[in-house]
UniProtKB/Swiss-Prot annotation:
Enables the recognition and targeting of unfolded and aggregated proteins to the ClpC protease or to other proteins involved in proteolysis. HAMAP family: MecA. Residues 80-89 have a biased composition (Acidic residues). It comes from Levilactobacillus brevis (strain ATCC 367 / BCRC 12310 / CIP 105137 / JCM 1170 / LMG 11437 / NCIMB 947 / NCTC 947) (Lactobacillus brevis). Homodimer. It comes from the Bacteria. Residues 77-102 are annotated as: Disordered. GO terms for molecular function: protein-macromolecule adaptor activity. Belongs to the MecA family. PANTHER family: ADAPTER PROTEIN MECA, ADAPTER PROTEIN MECA 1. The gene is mecA. This is Adapter protein MecA. The N-terminal domain probably binds unfolded/aggregated proteins; the C-terminal domain interacts with ClpC. InterPro entries: MecA_C_sf (IPR038471), Neg-reg_MecA (IPR008681). Disulfide bonds: none annotated.
Amino acid sequence: MEMERINENTIRVVIGNDDLTERGITVLDLLGNHKQIEGFFYSILEEVDVDHQFQDNDAVTFQVLPNRNGLELFISKNTDEDDVADESQGDASVDSEHPDQVSDQIKEHLLEKDNQKDFFSGFKSAANESNDIEDYLNDSGQPTTTRVVKLHSFEDMISLARVLRLENAASNLYRYQDAYYLELVFFVNESSRESIKDELAVAYEYAERTKVAPDVLAEHGQLIMDNSALELTRFHFLGNS
C-alpha cells in the first residue's frame, strides 16, 4: 500500500490486490457490503493518518477509483474551498456517512465508457456477450440445463475463469451464506452432451457439487455477476487474458 499527501486536505492511497487480500476483502465485496465498506475505509484512514489530522475531522469524504490492480482511494477533509470543488466534481466524492453510495460509485467507475478506454473495451465485449445470452435466456422456446457449483474461495473463481471458456452457456456468480456459488446455464440446442460434460469436468476441478438450488440462490443469494460471470472475472482480474 502506498500513500501520497496531495495537499493539506487530501491523501491519495494506492491499495493493491495483495493489500485487499491481506484484509480479507475484494472489490466485489465493496459492491454490496455497506458496513464492510465503511469499516474498510476507516481502517485505511487510521493507518495513513498518523497525525490524526483527518480522523478528528467530522466531514471526511472518500473517492474510489477501482482498477485492474486494486483501488486508488482519495481521502479528503472538507473545508469551504473543498465544498466549492465538490460542486464541480459532481458525484466524484462520497460522504463517509453514506457508504451505500460507494458501491454505486464503484459500479459506475467499472462501467465508465469514456475513462481508461483500453480497460473498458474488454468490459464492453463482455457486456455484449451478456446481452446475447440474455436474449437467449428470455426465449422460452430455447431449452436449458442448469448446474450449480460451490467455490472454495473467490481465488478459485479466478482460476476457473482462466481455463473454462464457455461457448454456449451463461454463468452467474452468487454469494450466499459466506460462500461463492457459480450457476452454469447450458443452452441445450447449442451444445452437445459431451461438451457440457467436459465443461462441468473442468468446473469440478475448482469447485464442488452442491445441493443448493438455483431458486435458492436467486431468492436468498447476492447476485455479483450476471450472465457472463466467467468472462467478467477474466476481464477484471486477469486482464481479459
